[in-house]
Amino acid sequence: MKEILNALYHQKDLNDGEVKKLFTLIINEKVSPAQLGAVLCALKIKGESFKEISVAATTLLEHAPKPFDSGLDLIDNCGTGGDGLKTINISTIAALIASSMGLSMAKHGSRSVSSHSGSADLLENLGVNIEMNPTQLENCFKQTHFGFLFAPLYHQSFKKSAPLRKELFTKTIFNCLGPLINPLRPKIQLLGVYEKSLCKTMALALKALGVKRAMVVNGGGTDEIVLHDTTHACELKNNGILEYDLSAKDFDLPPYDLKELQIKNAQESVQACLDILENKGKDSHTMVVVANVASLLYLSHKAKDLKEGVGMTLEHLKTKVPYTHLQKIIRLSHA
């Protein structure tokens, strides 16, 4: 541990062996609170490399139980969170809609730290059992194409280090790791990050982890694809990374103000979700979710481009199938 800290104090990147050793110690609770705080702050000040992030994620995955084997190329749209803008839960609503369209969504998530409603909070408030056992999870997934994996159930180091991380008053490597350590190891990811500068780093980390297809995005300071501002994207495709910007025009959708996405409490988040699924949501809410579903369809090769994905999603919402689909998920999650 002394050597690892010394390297970080001198602003040196850790090699693969050092990262693996460090996170194995963290998992096994062999690192004191003072040492963990020092490591996280030193990594933050130095700047985490994509190799450090990917090796840390690999180490955490090696210690996480895999609930079942689907045999499919699963999709996740978990983001880092941490943008602090208190918007509706775009990614979770998008995952529910995408799964109702047949996409195999393995949603990894946790409770909110900086928003009114994280993925776990929203699903729980909707009535979903967020702590499904492996049998329940597999059954729900097979019948609905949707499964929610509550991060603290699979990664105890996240749960146990949470109080210390909160006391640091800054984002750490743990924020980056959350979307990379889904125990079902999805091969397709739409990953939102809280800072534009992280897009390329996280795309490289996904590539190193063996993800086949991905888009890492930061839209106007949020960890989502948005319509109120430019969305910066790094797309992992054919083992290469394409970097570009997206605007509302790329989706053939009108722009909306960020303020229209912001909510005051968890109940507003629940109502926004239900309204969108019943095709009676505010246009500003519905359209930003549609843009994110369209991106999932594009990444999954179900739509040839983003505009086609938008059209497919809008037509699907008219059927109100997403709402009945949610009721099925709720029922099966408790079965």
Swiss-Prot record:
Pfam family, one: Glycos_transf_3
Catalytic activity line of the entry: N-(5-phospho-beta-D-ribosyl)anthranilate + diphosphate = 5-phospho-alpha-D-ribose 1-diphosphate + anthranilate
Origin: domain of life: Bacteria
Membrane-crossing residue ranges in chain numbering: none
ATP-binding in keyword set: no
Chain residues that bind anthranilate 2: R165
Residues that hold anthranilate 1 according to the record: G79
Protein name as it appears in the record: Anthranilate phosphoribosyltransferase
Positions of 5-phospho-alpha-D-ribose 1-diphosphate binding: 79, 82-83, 87, 89-92, 107-115, 119
The keyword Protein biosynthesis belongs to this UniProt entry's keyword annotation: no
Family to which this protein belongs: Belongs to the anthranilate phosphoribosyltransferase family.
UniProt record, GO biological process: L-tryptophan biosynthetic process
Source organism: Helicobacter pylori (strain Shi470)
Cofactor note (record): Binds 2 magnesium ions per monomer.
Pathway(s) it belongs to: Amino-acid biosynthesis; L-tryptophan biosynthesis; L-tryptophan from chorismate: step 2/5
Family matches, as InterPro entries: Anthranilate_Pribosyl_Tfrase, Glycosyl_Trfase_fam3, Glycosyl_Trfase_fam3_N_dom, Glycosyl_Trfase_fam3_N_dom_sf, Nuc_phospho_transferase
Cofactor(s) essential for the protein: Mg(2+)
